[in-house]
Amino acid sequence: MQKTNKFLKIGNKEFKSRLLVGTGKYSSLEVMQKSLINTKCEIVTVAVRRVQGLEHGHKGLMESIDWKRIWMLPNTAGCSNAEEAIRIARLGRELAKLAGQETNNFVKLEVIPDKKYLLPDPIGTLKAAEQLVKEGFTVLPYINSDPLIAKQLEEIGCATVMPLGSPIGSAQGIRNAANIAMIIAESRIPIIIDAGIGVPSEAAQALEMGADGVLINSAIALAENPILMAQAFSKATEAGRDGYLSGRLKENPLASPSSPLDGVISNN
Ligand SMILES: CC(=O)[C@@H](O)[C@H](O)COP(=O)(O)O
């Protein structure tokens, strides 16, 4: 289904920016702040567990983001089963309240038992999502690029699905484009490509394919110059969306001359 909405609509909120960003792995809070500004993002995800535990890089994080301008997307990173994820989602809602976002019921649902590839558990994700939807959360589940689980999550009331391009932090880009294309074609909710994007052109690729947004963390935070890379991702996301809306030239197995051949003076 072609989605031509001007804004990214998640639940009942609209966003101009289609680039969502993470807050982990930055060399300092100052670099993170400057990078976030350059992304022009309006949604920032925070790991509830890491913020609460004041883990490395997370002390002072809450205070360093302008929550009047940025919509918080609490995430359940570090949860390996549905029960933990539900508990952390509830804490995330309280965190958003503390930041002054009384009506924020968003949660980026991550249920990740696999420490090596950080792949999400589809059964645990579905179970947690069902409960969180019942509790009134706007649920954005992180999933493998599986069209069936994407559809099931849509049917139980998730606000988006967030299929991975490749494993978190791997910078391998979009390794599963065919499956992602199926998810995009079949969904009636926004699709946000989350994880594994390595360079801005891959963010553009996701948007060109018809994804509604991308979520980037490592490729910005761990770039040699994160502040400049943030800007590059912002431009790439916008370019990819414009490319999608413009309607691409269809691929052709044959060449097609750039100038008309009719009326050309013959050699004979
Ligand atoms: C911050 C966050 O939510 C990550 O778990 C997310 O999946 C981003 O992945 P990359 O770090 O690969 O961009």
From Swiss-Prot:
Annotated spans, Disordered = 248-268
EC number(s) given by UniProt: 2.8.1.10
Q: What is its main location?
A: cytoplasm
Q: In which pathway does it act?
A: Cofactor biosynthesis; thiamine diphosphate biosynthesis
Superkingdom: Bacteria
Give the positions the UniProt entry annotates as the active site. 108
* Xref: InterPro entries: Aldolase_TIM, Thiazole_synthase_ThiG, ThiG
Ranges of Polar residues compositional bias?
Answer: 255-268
Q: Enumerate the subcellular locations listed in this protein's record, separating them with semicolons.
A: Cytoplasm
Q: Which GO terms describe its cellular component?
A: cytoplasm
Instruction: Outline the subunit composition.
Output: Homotetramer. Forms heterodimers with either ThiH or ThiS.
Task: List the HAMAP family hit by this protein, alphabetically.
Answer: ThiG
User: What's the protein name?
Assistant: Thiazole synthase
Annotated source species: Prochlorococcus marinus (strain NATL2A)
Q: Which gene encodes it?
A: thiG
